[in-house]
Amino acid sequence: MKNLINYFIIPTILSFAFAFEIPDAIGYNGVVVCSKKEAAQIGIDILKKGGNAIDASVGVAFALAVTHPSAGNIGGGGFAMIRLANGDVTSFDFRETAPSLAYENMFLDSLNNVIPGKSKYTSWAAGVPGSVHGLGTIHKKFGSLPWDVLVYPSVNLARFGFELDLHNIIILNSERYKKLLANDIVSKKIFTKDVDYKIGDLLIQKDLSLTLERIAKYGYKEFYEGKTSDYIIECMNRTGGLISRNDLRNYKSVEREPITFSYRGYTIHSMPPPSSGGITLASIL
């Protein structure tokens, strides 16, 4: 592989404990590690087509947007730590940014008390998404396969569905998430049903497949300037969110110099701020 990458999307913290049997994994010439087998398989297939680690990471990230959106999604943001074959190390910050209309006390009432849930469960809590821009940026700079080759497998995964596993059904069947998903007319239509989900049920996400298809066909900027951006603005207008069209058009990923430190003779490279990971690791070690 020409490039090596560690790719991170900040996950939603879930208050569940899972006990899974972890199978042995053996690979040659490349390894793909993620939380869903469907996403891992897409990454493996990309490597077999001659793609590098960046290509595989992009494909896996879009697949996780279908199968495990709290670990990778097109509506959030993330970081990428990249080490090239020549030893060069760099990082990319594509975390969400605050909308231009955001202000200091937006989650407080007139008495300066926190408004419960407003900073978590409303459109006011939504930052300008960075995931698609970040994935497009690292692919443009380091990828080898065409963009659509990396994204289209996830189009099909959303269109034809994937089988739910234990992790999926625990979340979808929980009263907390049932309530949250039912609060919006779009997510209610897609995810809520009269009976609980079962392991092996097929989850089809037609609208997501259409969005991913546009991104695959027209490139990552479609998300910020094309029809997908129209849908985002429509959602903001419908739910009272703050993200504007200019916020989307002006979003930029940022390449940053990694934090570098030593531990027991090893050189460690990690993500700089706004990630807290690198600083925390350097402080602990």
What feature does the model see in each segment?
Residues 6-15:
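Bacterial N-terminal signal peptides
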Residues 1-2:
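N-terminal secretory signal peptides that target proteins for export/translocation
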Residues 20-41, 45, 53-218, 223-225, ...:
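Noncatalytic scaffold domains of N-terminal-nucleophile
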